[in-house]
Every structure is written in structure tokens, then in C-alpha cells.
Amino acid sequence: AAWFGGFPLQERWNHGYVVRWYGEPGLDATVYTPKVDFKFKNTTGNYLLIKPVVDKTKGTMTFQFYGTKPNWKVEAPKPTIDSRTAPPAPLYIEDPDMAPGAVVQFDWAVEGMNTTATRRVLAADGTVLRNDALKSRYYPWQAKYRFGPGFQPPAGAEVEWANR
């Protein structure tokens, strides 16, 4: 909401990995106590009500802004993906407590990427007030599996053997 509302961002940290249900890569923000935060400046000169909206079904939280309509317009195209990085080879972890030959995936591969989100904030008369860009780097993530005795992980996979 702060990005599309044209508010100047003062602090923003993207997630380390692409998390698809958080929305468009390049527009996410991490908030984590005590240091990682998301900050923007309210430049409207008026109060701003920020309403968090939680959707438990989708597992998402969004924010709605209410206040005096600012006298600027925002042009913000979809973020671009500047480069992609393939995920590492899958990791297979031997678990002697699992049934012989069993295998269970517990984490899924995600490619890494670098993205750029841009926006132009325009005055009512069309004068450009600000051109902004958000650069984000997301690291690749490997698929992870646990397997029981007797299972043979595929060639090329990273393997953690128990008691070897």
C-alpha cells in the first residue's frame, strides 16, 4: 500500500527467498524483531489510518490505507525479473527411523532471482515528483527429502547419511 500510495520508503528489506504466497517478487517486505523493519514517511500532511487485513485461508496479511487523498498520482508497472538462478541439487537426508524404502519431501525448490520494481510519483499537473526503484535479491532454495533405509537417492543429489 505504501509503494502504490506514493509514500517515500525509508526502510525496506525483501525476504531472502521468493515466497510465492506473499505476492509479486520485488514488492514484499520483511518485518522481524528487533531490527528488520519496514518504514515509510507519510507526506500527506494529514493523518493516515493503516488497517491490517489477515486472510487465514490464504495465509496472507495486507494493509489498507485510509486518509485524505494525496494530490499526486503513482505509475508503478509490474516488477521485472532481471536474472534467475536455478535452485541447488535436492538434499536427501537419511532417517533410520523411517520405514525401509520410504521417502518424504518436506521442502520444495525455489529459483533465486534479482528483481527491480519502479514507480513514478507525479504531481496533479503531471510534473514528476520522484522516480523510485526497489532492487531485490532472492537466493535459490533446494528441495529437501527424508528417506528410510534402503532408499537410493538419485544421482546428482546432495545426501546426508545417518551414522556414516
Short names for language-model regions:
Residues 1-164:
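Well-ordered beta-sheet/strand-loop patches within structured domains
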